[in-house]
Amino acid sequence: MKLSVYIILSILFISTVFYEIQFTEARQLRKTDDQDHDDHHFTVGYTDDFGPTSPGNSPGIGHKMKENEENAGGYKDDFEPTTPGHSPGVGHAVKNNEPNA
């Protein structure tokens, strides 16, 4: 019983000692005069947060998005699948089937 009381008191003492220590390697930043944010009150409801939109088509709000008219065929060579077990450029040599001249 006495041993468990000593263990609990030791844990509480150690935790109170290390409570104020910051375990970080980051540099502590100083507060400058230009960055004094104490006088600003951040509250919800500023009227300048969002500007009104013009009437008409608002994509994403009940209207369809504008279709992307890019030609997907122009990008068909961007990805070429490889056979299983061979990934050229990732530690493997590129196999060349042409005979050496």
Curated annotation (Swiss-Prot):
Family: Belongs to the C-terminally encoded plant signaling peptide (CEP) family.
Chain positions with Hydroxyproline modification: 52, 55, 59, 81, 84, 88
Annotated region (Disordered), positions in chain: 29-101
Keyword Transport in record: no
Propeptide feature ranges: 27-48, 64-77, 93-101
Record carries keyword Nuclease: no
GO biological process assignments: cellular response to nitrogen starvation; nitrate import; regulation of leaf morphogenesis; regulation of root development; root development
Assembly and interaction partners: Interacts with CEP receptors (e.g. CEPR1 and CEPR2).
Role, per record: Extracellular signaling peptide that represses primary root growth rate. Modulates leaf morphology. Regulates systemic nitrogen (N)-demand signaling. Mediates up-regulation of genes involved in N uptake and assimilation pathways.
GO molecular function, one term: hormone activity
This protein's name: Precursor of CEP6
Keywords: Apoplast, Developmental protein, Hormone, Hydroxylation, Secreted, Signal
Expression sites by tissue: Expressed in lateral root primordia and in lateral roots excluding the meristem region. Also present in the aerial tissues, such as leaf petioles and the shoot apex region.
GO cellular component: apoplast
Biased composition (Basic and acidic residues): 29-42, 64-79
Induction note: Triggered by nitrogen depletion.
Post-translational modifications reported in the UniProt record: The mature small signaling peptide is generated by proteolytic processing of the longer precursor.
Disulfide bonds, paired cysteine numbers: none
Signal sequence coordinates: 1-26
